[in-house]
Structure formats: structure tokens, C-alpha cells
Amino acid sequence: MYKRQVQGNSAVEQWTNLESLNVLEERFGVQKTQELIKQYESNWITEWDIQNISAMGCNVIRVPFWYRNFMSTPEGAWLSENPDENPGFQRLDWLIEMAEKYGLYVVLDMHGCPGGQSTDHCSGSARKSELFTNIVYQDAMERLWIEIASRYKESPAVAAYDIMNEPQINGEIESVDEDPRNQLYDRMIKAIRKVDPNHILMLEGIWSLSALPDPNEAGWNNVVYEVHPYGITDTDSECEKYKQYNQSHDVPVY
């Protein structure tokens, strides 16, 4: 798999510019702000870019998005109740269409979840992480994934759903089973599987696969475990660990 991430597709790395987005909405309102974002997006990633990615020999693009591409609040108020008129779905529709046209698969990556899945800038949480302690935000996340899975369940160009990017929590975890990240993963998997039993689901251990449970014991099927190994110096050693985990747990590792 040769992957390219279309970073910035969802408007100027919105998850790193939460305050800027809020200021725009305060000054110009939600509608005018969405018009500005739409104009930016349509010029930031174009058909030429997708065609060029394909020509480079890539076969997969990872498309990061956050909840505010679809919702105006972390409680889950839709920008438009009609999915066909929702700017988030309009943009994903276009990207998936272009990917299919140029022979690419798409990984749909929820980069920023309602309430924030970490305190890092990439979650758009402005130094706050409330997803794992706020059931309302979890409900909004579930509704968004159900809508996404319902919309793209028949799409041959969609390779996988990456449920949440680099989830982190504060404090120590006594066991893998008690990890609120895995509890939330389990909830999202069950919700998605009710509407889409076929697409691959990607689950991130971030830096260590040991943060994730045995998928067979958890009852998770058709999943891929994912790591983001920044700054590894002993690449061969780490890759051997991933290989051993793959063999011992019978789960693909990416």
C-alpha cells in the first residue's frame, strides 16, 4: 500500500485553527463562514491533485476530517439536517468520486472528534480532551459515524474507516479492558457494524499495539491495528515487534 494523506482538505487544518474558526463564525455567522471554507477547500485540493497522486504510484489516500466539517457544536447539531446539503458530506462525496475516477482507495479518518480525543492540536480540542468523559460528545460521534457508514457502505472506493486519530487520555490505565479508548472503540464498532458490516475498521494504538485488546477476545472482526511510530531509531526492531503482534493476534498491522 502506497499512501498519501490529503492534509488540509478539510479547510486549513481546521483542527489546528479552532480559535480562528470560532472568530470567523462570531463575526460573519455560520453560513458565511461555511461559504469561505467551501471556497478554500475547492481550491486547496483539486482534481489535478488527485490525478497527480495516482500518477505518483500511490493507491490509497487518507482523508482527515473533523466533526465540525459536519456539525456546528460538539453536542452534535448538524450544519444541515439533509446529508446531501451538508458541506462535510458534499466534500467527501467529491473526494471519493475523484479517487474512484483515478483508481485510488480512500481511508476516512476522523481526525478531530467531538470534545477532542486528546489534548494535542490535531484533535481541534484547544488543549482540552473531554470525549472520554462526556456521554453527549460520544453520542454525537456515534451519530456521525453511523451517518458516514450509512452513506458510503456501498462505495467500492472506500477502503476503511479510521475511527479516531491518535486517541490519548490523562492518567494511568489499570488494564486494557478498562481503557476508555477501547471502550469507546467497542461502542463505535458496534454502531458502525449495524449499518455497514463490510468495510475495514482501523483502530489506533498510536505508539504501542499493546494498548489495544486482542481483537478475537473483544469480538472485533475485519479490523486493522494502526501505529504512528514517530521518530523511531531502531526501525527493524520495531517492525519485528509489529510482525510478532500480527502473528500472535491474527490481526493486520499498519
Residue ranges of each PLM-predicted region?
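An active-site-proximal structural segment forming one wall of the substrate-binding cleft
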Residues: K32-I61, F65, N69-M71, E75-I163, ...
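Short, small-residue-biased leader/transition segments that mark boundaries at the very start
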Residues: M1-Y2
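Short, flexible, mixed-charge acidic loops at enzyme active sites
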Residues: V6-E19, G116-S125
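Short, surface-exposed linear patches
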Residues: V12-L18, D84-E85, K128-E130, V223-Y225, ...
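Alpha-helix capping and helix-coil boundary motifs
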Residues: E13-S20, D84-P87, D177, T235-E238
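Charged, glycine/proline-rich intrinsically disordered loops and linkers
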Residues: S10-Q34
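Extracellular glycoside hydrolase catalytic/binding regions
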Residues: V136, E142-Y254
